[in-house]
Amino acid sequence: MAKIIAFDEEARRGLERGLNSLADAVKVTLGPKGRNVVLEKKWGAPTITNDGVSIAKEIELEDPYEKIGAELVKEVAKKTDDVAGDGTTTATVLAQALVREGLRNVAAGANPLGLKRGIEKAVEAVTAKLLDTAKEVETKEQIAATAGISAGDSTIGELIAEAMDKVGKEGVITVEESNSFGLQLELTEGMRFDKGYISLYFATDAERQEAVLEDPYILLVSSKISTVKDLLPLLEKVIQAGKPLLIIAEDVEGEALSTLVVNKIRGTFKSVAVKAPGFGDRRKAQLADIAILTGGEVVSEEVGLSLETAGIELLGRARKVVVTKDETTIVEGAGDADAIAGRVNQIRAEIEASDSDYDREKLQERLAKLAGGVAVIKAGAATEVELKERKHRIEDAVRNAKAAVEEGIVAGGGVALLQSSPVLDDLKLEGDEATGANIVKVALEAPLKQIAFNAGLEPGVVAEKVRNLPAGSGLNAATGEYEDLLAAGINDPVKVTRSALQNAASIAALFLTTEAVVADKPEKAAAPMGDPTGGMGGMDF
């Protein structure tokens, strides 16, 4: 495909126009009095949202240079969302301010590379200041306040705080759509995975269609079990011990399955067979997780273990196992605490190293099953449009709360950024680097000014007043009052604020140092087709 190329000021201004188009659509949502944006969908009802990254993803511009500019800012929003789960609008507003001030200085003759170095040093200093002033999240109320601000609803904040209190910071909190109105919280005790019994005959409670095994042995096998002779030596040892048996294998079929079922029906021996969760390598990993949790070993030819020679010492233990047709829950596995902690650290390292959102999500689920628990928030609403918007808000708020627990909180409402700017006066920079630091200083005011503007206040007046207030005090845009924001429960996770600034500065530096833009040449629209009837009017068909 043919390309078009723009240089110097033309290239940078084209990118800036794209950035501004996207940022102007996103920034109207900032703050407690921010508005919503309606997004048209090709299929189904339109989406109404105030989430920066969702809005950014939908924007496609026609001009090739503007399109590239918008794509670069989308990257800011997406990266911030990936790292912190919130702060996408703040990141976009900061990027716009940094680029606007930066391009003004480049046009006036400043060296872009000098500005870039100055911006990087200034951002490093502000980040250190934010981390230094962050307050640890110690109470349920602080988590509720942080999540409530993100979701724009204190009830959601309280529910998320309740969920985090129950499952711990390593636990997984998922959000599901509900057919009923309002919000519900469901908690899972122990490790649960989405595979149920292979045969209904294993159920111990016919009415509830579930099998409950008290103090069972747990056999983990990485392959299929089809012949009973493989299983018999081990079954005899378990029967002698007088305990029930849970078998988790790739599959249990044929005479092995029928033998287990017949013994269960006759009351000779209580057992349940379940297929192992996941597929391929993920199945192996999950079996290993269950083995560590229950203190057993996975019987696998890869490690030289076979069913015929397996002894009772290879079996795991748990206080209780509950199996339904759809899922299995293992309560209080008898695994060694140090081994479980080691496995948790290993999974955590894999999460850090992974660059796939899907893999990270699956690893996080495994981590929760081992270290914490799983809470499900069920959200309902009157219409599908409202339901999707509400679900999205809750998901963002959950990630926001987790970020707060991780690195602490700072004053919200753009105040922490503005009140961190004096640290830049201590930097001993000269020339274009000093100008770069000043660009950051100006940009740090942008989020607060936008929040004030969205609340119908005069941005410049608000920024000047907040600058002279004690640290942590600022504008409560919801009420229009100036107060101690942390005491009032208006806070942001420092991880969100820090990520927004770092990602915005990264993209702004790329904008300023760009000297040429190569884009696809827009294709001309095809000429309309002629009249298939050849212009012969008046004919009946």
Swiss-Prot record:
Gene Ontology BP annotations: protein refolding
Pfam families per UniProt: Cpn60_TCP1
E.C. designation(s): 5.6.1.7
Sites where the protein binds ATP: 29-32, 86-90, 413, 476-478, 492
Any one GO MF annotation of this record: ATP binding
Gene3D superfamilies, per database record: GroEL (3.50.7.10), GroEL-like equatorial domain (1.10.560.10), TCP-1-like chaperonin intermediate domain (3.30.260.10)
Domain of life from the UniProt record: Bacteria
Organism: Rhodococcus hoagii (Corynebacterium equii)
Similarity comment: family membership: Belongs to the chaperonin (HSP60) family.
Reactions the enzyme catalyzes: ATP + H2O + a folded polypeptide = ADP + phosphate + an unfolded polypeptide
Alphabetized CDD domains for the sequence: GroEL
Main localisation: cytoplasm
Keywords assigned by UniProt, alphabetized: ATP-binding, Chaperone, Cytoplasm, Isomerase, Nucleotide-binding
Assembly with partners or alone: Forms a cylinder of 14 subunits composed of two heptameric rings stacked back-to-back. Interacts with the co-chaperonin GroES.
Function: Together with its co-chaperonin GroES, plays an essential role in assisting protein folding. The GroEL-GroES system forms a nano-cage that allows encapsulation of the non-native substrate proteins and provides a physical environment optimized to promote and accelerate protein folding.
Gene that encodes the chain: groEL
Location in or out of the cell: Cytoplasm
GO CC aspect terms: cytoplasm
Protein name: Chaperonin GroEL
